[in-house]
Swiss-Prot record:
Recorded catalytic activity of this chain's protein: 6-phospho-D-gluconate = 2-dehydro-3-deoxy-6-phospho-D-gluconate + H2O
Keywords assigned by UniProt, alphabetized: 4Fe-4S, Carbohydrate metabolism, Gluconate utilization, Iron, Iron-sulfur, Lyase, Metal-binding
Name this polypeptide is given: Phosphogluconate dehydratase
Organism (species): Escherichia coli (strain K12)
CC cofactor note: Binds 1 [4Fe-4S] cluster.
Enzyme class per UniProt: lyase
Induction details: By growth on gluconate.
GO CC annotations, alphabetized: cytosol
Length: 603
């Protein structure tokens, strides 16, 4: 095993000793003291199966068969979640064949960040993770179930569902993906059209045609954003079946994997022979494997918050130092857009998760001795699923990458440093997705241009006010200020400025999409401006140093002058009403800082 990996793992174990012990005691108590449906009052039980088919009613009355909860995030708004419409039918059929029953226990909201990008609704996005966790818990609270299947793929949905699953950690759980859409317009061409539109060189219809050719079918978007990072991370964590992440929707193999997930969760229940509740399955080693997956693939920076919140739900305490120290030894081994031209389908064709797991295991950069939904040992995830005469089976995946431009070997990685860098300095702490930023753009020292809203940046760009070396500061975008929206709309104009050979960087306490690209961006700055962060004292013209290589984020202003400055705190009341934002006020006020997971749920 890599010594650094062991050191980080051991310090997480030590740091989490009390909280993890308390969590395990809690789920053990839940296992023994939670009222099972066999102890429900007759009226409770009758309500629970009133809408079931006669055969299922008889099974639930007898108490001899497993009842599996289905928590679904189906809606028609998310291309990745539309395939879930018919999953309950597939699952119920598979469960019947396994002498079990399946009930849709509840639905959770699922927001498409692609639809709300740059809109008021984006200010609900991060908060929706907490709502998803709570909504799933409502479904599971009926105490009718022996296990659960979680149907979710996209940005906040998988982290929220994980938090809920761990709150019911005495139950086994399997996550069930939907898979990516087929490749459409190449991502590089899509970005080219976006930048031309930002410069006024193509019209809205040309832009719309480009976007519609990129996002064109059911399934996840094919770039390597937060949705596909979710799938990568949870497969490395053993939360879904081996090789199941990136199989296309509506294919025979996808349907077979969905049915197999249903059968597998029945084996993991107290009535089966492989009892493994999710709260015991997800331990410190599993969490470290998830971080390694993120770093080795240059995944979404959103997971520097999501993984923290997910781990906390299991009583495990991680922080950005853990990400940073692992990033020093975990190389970048995948090049997927925005880190390169390939998409997630190219990744799958190059050997996918099995190749990457195999390489990292050989290098001693993953814990093999972990429990997974497929059984003990992460080496199971070097297998790939296939249909053998119409029957699902697993075989050894590729021994090495089938396309070295997409998946590199450990010996010849794309970079010897992981795809995420933690920055620190007097401005606070932040993260940068370095995997997508050319080395020559990772260091900048330039005057600040300060904005209080992302919507003010484009007019300044159009007026030529940013045609110079500068650090664009967009503040009061943190969790407590306005829910920490993604600021991906800033990328086209800032990308144009880079192409004009200006030295440009972004510094913000907000988020960027998992598809954040070539602009060096110090994001998730904590403490946020609204909550006492020095970012609130930055003024136009102040020199800021951003160094994605050494990990520096410094405001080069005399300390005495900074101490004398008053922080600028704008009136944000107008941004807290409308589009339902007023309903989330109580949650927003309780959100922790980005490094603490930006969560309002205490575990």
């Amino acid at each position: 095993m890599n010594p650094q990996l062991l050191r980080v793992t051991n310090r997480i174990i030590e740091r989490s000793r009390e909280t993890r012990s308390a969590y395990l005691a809690r789920i053990e108590q839940a296992k023994t003291s939670t009222v099972h449906r066999s102890q429900l009052a007759c009226g409770n039980l009758a309500h629970g199966f009133a809408a079931c088919q006669p055969e299922d009613k008889a099974s639930l009355k007898s108490m001899l068969r497993n009842n599996i909860a289905i928590i679904t995030s189906y809606n028609d708004m998310l291309s990745a979640h539309q395939p879930y419409e018919h999953y309950p039918e597939i699952i119920r059929k598979a469960l019947h064949e396994a002498n079990a029953v399946g009930q849709v226990a509840g639905g959770v909201p699922a927001m498409c960040d692609g639809v709300t990008q740059g809109q008021d609704g984006m200010e609900l996005s991060l908060l929706s993770r907490e709502v998803i966790a709570m909504s799933a818990a409502v479904g599971l609270s009926h105490n009718m179930f022996d296990g659960a299947l979680f149907l979710g793929v996209c940005d906040k949905i998988v982290p929220g569902l994980t938090m809920a699953a761990l709150s019911f950690g005495h139950l086994p759980a399997v996550f069930v993906p939907s898979g990516p859409m087929a490749s459409g317009l190449p991502n590089k061409e899509k970005v080219r059209i976006r930048q031309l539109y930002a410069e006024g060189k193509v019209d809205r219809m040309a832009l719309l045609e480009s976007e519609a050719a990129s996002y064109h079918a059911p399934g996840t978007c094919t770039f390597y954003g937060t949705a596909n990072t979710n799938q990568m991370v949870v497969e490395f964590m053993g939360m879904q079946l081996p090789g199941s992440s990136f199989v296309h929707p509506d294919s025979p193999l996808r349907d077979a994997l969905t049915a197999a997930a249903a059968r597998q969760v029945t084996r993991m229940t107290g009535n089966g022979n492989e009892w493994m509740p999710i709260g015991k399955m997800i331990d410190e080693k599993v969490v470290v494997n998830g971080i390694v997956a993120l770093l080795a693939t240059g995944g979404s920076t959103n997971h520097t918050m999501h993984l923290v919140a997910m781990a906390r739900a299991a009583g495990i305490q991680i922080n950005w130092d853990d990400f940073s120290d692992l990033s020093d030894v975990v190389p970048l081994m995948a090049r997927l857009y925005p880190n390169g031209p390939a998409d997630i389908n190219h990744f799958q064709a190059a050997g996918g998760v099995p190749v990457l797991v195999r390489e990292l295991l050989k290098a001693g950069l993953l814990h093999e001795d972990v429990n997974t939904v497929a059984g003990f040992g992460l080496s199971r995830y070097t297998l790939e699923p296939w249909l053998n005469n119409g029957e699902l089976d697993w075989r050894e995946g590729a021994e090495k990458s089938l396309d070295s431009n997409v998946i590199a070997s450990f010996e010849q990685p794309f970079s010897h440093h992981g795809g995420t860098k933690v920055l620190s300095g007097n401005l606070g702490r932040a993260v940068m997705k370095t995997s997508a930023v050319p080395v020559e753009n990772q260091v900048i020292e330039a005057p600040a241009v300060v904005f209080e809203s992302q919507h003010d940046v484009m007019p300044a760009f159009e007026a030529g006010l940013l045609d110079r070396d500068c650090v664009v500061v967009v503040r009061h975008q943190g969790p407590k200020a306005n829910g920490m929206p993604e600021l991906h709309k800033l990328m086209p104009p800032l990308g144009v400025l880079l192409d004009r050979c200006f030295k440009i960087a972004l510094v913000t306490d907000g988020r960027l999409s998992g598809a954040s690209g070539k602009v060096p961006s110090a994001i998730h700055v904590t403490p946020e401006a609204y909550d006492g962060g020095l970012l609130a004292k930055v003024r136009d013209g102040d020199i800021i140093r951003v160094n994605g290589q050494t990990g520096e984020l410094t405001l080069l202003v005399d300390e005495a002058e900074l101490a004398a400055r008053e922080p600028h705190i704008p009136d944000l009341s107008a941004s807290r009403v409308g589009t339902g934002r007023e309903l989330f006020s109580a949650l927003r006020e309780k959100l922790s800082g980005a490094e603490q997971g930006a969560t309002c749920i205490t575990f």
